[in-house]
Each structure stands twice: as C-alpha cells, then as structure tokens.
C-alpha cells in the first residue's frame, strides 16, 4: 500500500508538469502493474501536492500577483489611478491575465459536467483514445514549437484575448492523453510565446483550476477510494517533492533546448497504447 502510494505520487509529480499527460500515466501505471486504480480522494490529494509545489517554486510571483493586483484594484476604484509599467504593474497585469484565462475553462468545465453524459468520460478513458490523444496533441506541440519562433518574452506582450484562448484550451485536458500543460504550452507557442514564458504562464494559469479542483475533490464527500487518508497524504507529500524537482529541471531544460524529446516520447508511447488496445 505504501509503495503504491509512493509510486503513484512519483508519477503524478513527474507527469503533472511535463507535457505528457499525468492522467494517462496514472491510469496506465495502475493497469499495467495491477495496482488499485486511484479514486477521487487520492487523485485530489496528489494534485494538491503538485499545486503546492508550484506555489512554493513561484512563491515570489504568487505573492506579487496577490498583493499588487489587490493594491492596483483598490487604487483604481478609490482614486482612478493606473500604475505605469514596472515590476509592480507586471504582477498586476499577470494577475489580470490569469483571471481572464481562468474564467473560460471554469465556464466550459461547468457546461461539460452539466450537459455531457458521464458515459463520455468513461468511454474516453481507454487505451486507444489515450494513445491517439498522445500522438495527435504531441505532434501539435512539435509543430507549434518548430514553426513559431520566439517573439513574446514578457508579460506586457500578452493580450487578454490570448490569455482567454490559452485558458479555454485547458478544457481539452478532460481527454486522458491530452495533457493540460501540454495543450496550454502548445497554444502559447502557436501565439508566439517564447518557451520560458509559455511554460511559466502555463504553470501559473494551472494553479487556480488545479488547486480549487483538488480542494473540491477532498471536500465533495467520501468515495470508494481504496487509498485511505494516510496513504493519500503520503502520495501528496511525494508528489510535492517530486513536482518541485521536475518544475525546476524543466525550466532549465527548455531554456537550452526544444520540446522535441517530449514529442518523440508522446508519439512512441501513444503508438504503444494504440497497438496494445487491439489485444
């Protein structure tokens, strides 16, 4: 049990931030190693673990966004004052961009949950669908990364329309194999973000959705999760530590190279799943 929780926590910590789909890997690992498929409570716990890893790594950004956005909104409401461009206003703009990027995925997510039959989500969780999603969206990442050269390297170059598009793209991540970070990074690269800005914005944009989603999963009520509170806590701690290391490593890697290795991995892993699905 402890080993299973640790193993699943490691997989979540690695795959949550890499553009290779954490959901697909968690599901496949459980199936291949004959582990118990994690329930909502465990998945929410390890998701929160990686969320806290992001908060710690980007603590300066998160603190600046909260404090400066609040300060700017208060100043504007009270005095009609707008700040000039600068470090403080960078945090204010980033905060507003994250809000506009979060709104569409929340609305679209609500509509999907409300109107799409539960059978759709169950049907999507199969080897063939995951394999195809890994391949198709992996090729899209490779195409965007190779074709669209870096142009936008700072927050002030991002428009609110672009933040809405990137935020809305997250809805595709309901399909196992797509990858939330993968689709947002891909969209950002199509919009000519440089790699570091694409990854930074993608990670920060994920925080509201993953944190709120993780908290909701914990308080939504008991489920039939095989993993108890203790094992879920172990998984969360492991995913936090591993996630922190992966975020740091990824940001160093993409400053020196492209996403091509992730594209190759997605295509090969996707082909493997498609082939296995026929047996």
From Swiss-Prot:
Keyword set, alphabetical order: Antibiotic resistance, Cell membrane, Cell shape, Cell wall biogenesis/degradation, Hydrolase, Membrane, Peptidoglycan synthesis, Transmembrane, Transmembrane helix
Transmembrane segments: 1-21, 39-59, 96-116, 128-148, 155-175, 201-221, 231-251, 259-279
Compartments, record wording: Cell membrane
Alphabetized GO MF terms: undecaprenyl-diphosphatase activity
GO biological process: cell wall organization; peptidoglycan biosynthetic process; regulation of cell shape; response to antibiotic
Gene Ontology CC: one annotated term: plasma membrane
Membrane topology field: Multi-pass membrane protein
InterPro entries, per database record: UppP
Function: Catalyzes the dephosphorylation of undecaprenyl diphosphate (UPP). Confers resistance to bacitracin.
Protein name (record): Undecaprenyl-diphosphatase
The organism of origin for this protein: Tropheryma whipplei (strain Twist)
Organismal lineage: Bacteria, Bacillati, Actinomycetota, Actinomycetes, Micrococcales
């Amino acid at each position: 049990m402890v080993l299973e929780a640790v193993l699943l926590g490691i997989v979540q910590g690695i795959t949550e931030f890499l553009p290779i789909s954490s959901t697909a890997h968690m599901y496949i690992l459980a199936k291949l190693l004959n582990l118990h498929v994690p329930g909502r409570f465990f998945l929410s716990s390890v998701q929160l673990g990686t969320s806290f890893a992001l908060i710690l790594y980007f603590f300066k950004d998160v603190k600046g966004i909260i404090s400066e956005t609040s300060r700017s909104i208060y100043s504007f409401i009270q005095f009609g004052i707008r700040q000039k461009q600068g470090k403080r206003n960078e945090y204010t703009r980033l905060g507003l961009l994250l809000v506009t990027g979060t709104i569409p995925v929340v609305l679209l997510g609500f509509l999907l949950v409300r109107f799409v039959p539960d059978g759709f989500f169950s049907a999507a969780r199969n080897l063939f669908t995951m394999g195809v999603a890994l391949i198709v969206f992996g090729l899209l990442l490779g195409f965007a990364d190779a074709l669209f050269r870096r142009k936008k390297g700072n927050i002030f170059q991002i428009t609110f329309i672009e933040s809405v598009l990137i935020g809305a793209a997250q809805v595709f991540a309901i399909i196992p194999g797509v990858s939330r970070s993968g689709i947002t990074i891909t969209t950002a690269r199509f919009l000519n973000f440089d790699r570091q800005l694409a990854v930074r914005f993608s990670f920060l944009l994920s925080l509201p959705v993953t944190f709120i989603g993780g908290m909701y999963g914990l308080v939504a009520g008991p489920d039939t999760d095989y993993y108890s509170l203790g094992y879920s806590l172990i998984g969360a701690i492991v995913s936090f530590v591993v996630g922190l290391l992966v975020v740091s490593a990824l940001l160093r890697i993409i400053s020196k190279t492209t996403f091509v290795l992730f594209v190759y991995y997605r295509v090969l892993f996707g082909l493997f799943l498609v082939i296995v699905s026929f047996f």
